Amino acid sequence: MAKKIISFASDFGLQDGSVGVVKGVISRIDKDILVNDISHQIPPQDIKYGSLLLMRAIQYIPQGVLLAVVDPGVGTDRKAIAITTDWGVMIGPDNGLLNLACATVGGAQKAYALENENWIIPHEGNTFHARDIFAPFAAGYASGELKLEEFGPELDLEDLKQYLIPLTDITDDEIKGEVLYIDEFGNCQTNISPQELTDKDYKVGDVIPIKIDNQELSAKWCETYKNETIGGIGIVIDSWGMASLFLSNGNAQKLLNCKDNSKVII
């Protein structure tokens, strides 16, 4: 396992220096650690968005250490944790942020609380655990200076917080799902799988009736983001294998005025 790589994701943005400070802490512990930035533009405090992003990214980033911080409960009694998997070690807050990524690589094996005082940076405030706790533990482990058993007490996996992807509700007549994720282009990924569409006898090229919240429309099932019905909504199976609503040369989210959790009925 390539332990000298830390992949880092957060909702910090790039304006106030938080990302640079965290990476600086890592470099001070071991300047040879490579930090791979996944994203720092996760919407603020959006654990759902962050967990979905990590679930997708974990399949393609190098094995080693994942440092992920979307932490609206920072400074409260929520635990700072490390989870071991076949992929490597995932470090972050115990708020459900990490569990989809863990499940994607075969599930959690062990979990530890980050409580070793020797690896916690002394601090006056209690609002920057990425700098004071997560980064030192991630760097210590990646460098080989800190063993997992030295992190702190082992935790019961069943006690860890979970975020679960909502399941579709399928009846004889309908597939009831929702919008999971909206990307930068306004494409709206749903929790509806291609198998669920084909089980209803839909196929590529079909025009499918859809209801989004209170809007009724039709969308053509396309193989790519090119829809010959210019200005029309299409359905494509996106790069993550889910049915996604798109607008050719446009922004489906703005046209439909939908959002995360918008109800989608086919």
How would you label these PLM feature ranges?
Residues G17, V21, D30, Q45, ...:
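Conserved active-site and cofactor/substrate-binding residues in soluble primary-metabolism enzymes
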Residues S10-F12, I38, V69-P72, T85-D86, ...:
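Fold-independent oxyanion-binding glycine-rich loops
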Residues M1-D77:
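N-terminal glycine-/serine-/threonine-rich phosphate-binding loop
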Residues K4-I5, I29, Y49, Y60-V70, ...:
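Active-site histidine-anchored catalytic micro-motif
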Residues K4-S7, I33-N36, G64-L67, A80-A82, ...:
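Structural motif
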Residues Q189-N257:
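A conserved acidic, glycine/proline-rich C-terminal tail/linker
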Residues G107, I121-Y202:
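Anionic-ligand-binding alpha/beta catalytic cores of soluble enzymes and soluble regulatory domains
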